[in-house]
């Protein structure tokens, strides 16, 4: 009886390469500073958008104003893309530098600010606002200061040894928001006291309201940053 040649089968463990500890770790942990880099890019873009919007109050040239409004929209679109990238990385990475919910909330709140800046610029164009009130200019300046504080605070979050600096920025953001509330309330009171024409009153109130809401959204970012500090202190 002839013997059959023995067959050699590769075991499943031989056919599939093993995932080493280092490979597993790189899968679980995002690239060094990935989320911090994305947030730094996001807030830098937001600051550029806020500064661009603020240029509206420095010119009376309609073509320049329209160019500024277009640029504000472009920067808002860029912010949307960065937010989407943050959400994609959040889905793809198992371990994150702080709570996933906080990362999602921080990205959403930053995006909200950009949306309201762009929304204010669009209303100025759509409503054919020809003259800007002093309060609009002052609110825009407050917004730029808030976003500048956000940009610095978010970059400081990379190292928790900067926690005190972040807390100081949070206090300043909230204080600026309170100032914006006062400016808005006084402006609306003046509109009614001056008995402005109904159409003009509606246009001014819409623009002022959107601009003031943008400052409120800055406070939302400050609240998220404070939550992150509390959880990681």
Positions of predicted regions on the chain:
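Cytosolic, long alpha-helical scaffolding segments
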Residues: 2-233
């Amino acid at each position: 009886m002839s013997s059959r040649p023995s067959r050699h089968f590769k075991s499943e463990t031989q056919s599939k390469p093993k995932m080493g500890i280092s490979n597993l770790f790189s899968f679980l942990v995002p690239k060094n500073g990935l989320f911090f880099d994305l947030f730094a890019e996001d807030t830098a873009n937001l600051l550029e958008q806020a500064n661009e919007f603020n240029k509206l109050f420095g010119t009376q040239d309609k073509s320049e104003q329209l160019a500024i409004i277009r640029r504000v929209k472009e920067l808002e679109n860029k912010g949307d893309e960065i937010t989407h990238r943050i959400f994609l990385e959040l889905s793809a990475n198992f371990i994150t530098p702080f709570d996933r919910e906080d990362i999602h909330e921080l990205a959403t709140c930053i995006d909200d600010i950009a949306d309201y800046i762009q929304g204010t610029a669009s209303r100025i164009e759509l409503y054919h606002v020809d003259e800007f009130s002093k309060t609009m200019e002052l609110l825009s300046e407050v917004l730029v200061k808030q976003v500048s504080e956000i940009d610095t605070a978010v970059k400081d979050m990379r190292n928790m040894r900067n926690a005190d600096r972040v807390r100081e920025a949070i206090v300043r953001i909230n204080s600026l928001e309170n100032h914006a509330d006062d400016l808005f309330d006084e402006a609306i009171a003046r509109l009614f006291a001056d008995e402005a024409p109904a159409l003009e009153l509606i246009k001014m109130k819409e623009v002022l309201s959107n601009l003031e809401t943008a400052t409120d959204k800055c406070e939302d970012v400050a609240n998220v940053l404070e939550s992150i500090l509390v959880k990681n202190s």
